[in-house]
């Protein structure tokens, strides 16, 4: 879901997806900005790309009636979802690569929301990762050169996404530490 956040390019850093970062930091951020005279509920929004995302994707991806759709709060769930569903390839639409941010050393530690995709490659659970950055990301593929050289990773635009097989599963992550709670109704409209 943070693929669509029009404020992502202003944020650097990392947020572990836990209760504190999902809920409390939004209240803190809201009141800090309000004291400065800024209403972040007006400036922090989703981009217009959300309106035609599914139409563009359906041109190149075959969704069947039995395609599973899973909703979670954390990208960490994607790791288990990929393993449980025995997928060979993952297409990730996100403002972050989730490959791990310490090069190959990222995989020496437990799986988390920032390295789940890289960990799947490292452990041989998937053969290919396809990353479709959101239009507001501040990341770029060269930041992951060491990982890119070690594994089969493609960086695509939304229009370049193609699937030869019907899509078995869709995982949609709200990612609450990146997605402002006042956008929840828009999230529901996107999903349903």
Predicted regions and their residues:
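Conserved alpha-helical scaffold segments that buttress catalytic/binding sites
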Residues: 1-192
């Amino acid at each position: 879901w943070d693929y669509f956040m029009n404020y992502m390019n202003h944020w650097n850093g990392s947020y572990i997806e836990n209760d504190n970062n999902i809920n409390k930091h939004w209240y803190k951020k809201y009141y800090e900005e309000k004291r400065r005279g800024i209403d972040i509920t007006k400036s922090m929004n989703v981009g217009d790309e959300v309106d035609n995302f599914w139409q563009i994707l359906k041109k190149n991806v075959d969704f069947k009636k039995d395609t599973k759709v899973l909703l979670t709060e954390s990208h960490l769930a994607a790791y288990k979802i990929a393993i449980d569903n025995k997928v060979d390839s993952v297409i990730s639409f996100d403002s972050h690569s989730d490959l791990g941010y310490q090069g190959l050393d990222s995989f020496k530690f437990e799986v988390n929301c920032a390295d789940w995709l890289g960990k799947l490659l490292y452990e041989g659970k998937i053969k290919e990762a396809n990353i479709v950055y959101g239009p507001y990301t501040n990341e770029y593929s060269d930041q992951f050169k060491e990982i890119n050289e070690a594994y089969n990773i493609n960086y695509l635009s939304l229009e370049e996404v193609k699937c030869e097989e019907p899509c078995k599963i869709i995982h949609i992550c709200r990612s609450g530490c990146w997605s402002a709670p006042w956008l929840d109704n828009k999230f529901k409209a996107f999903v349903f």
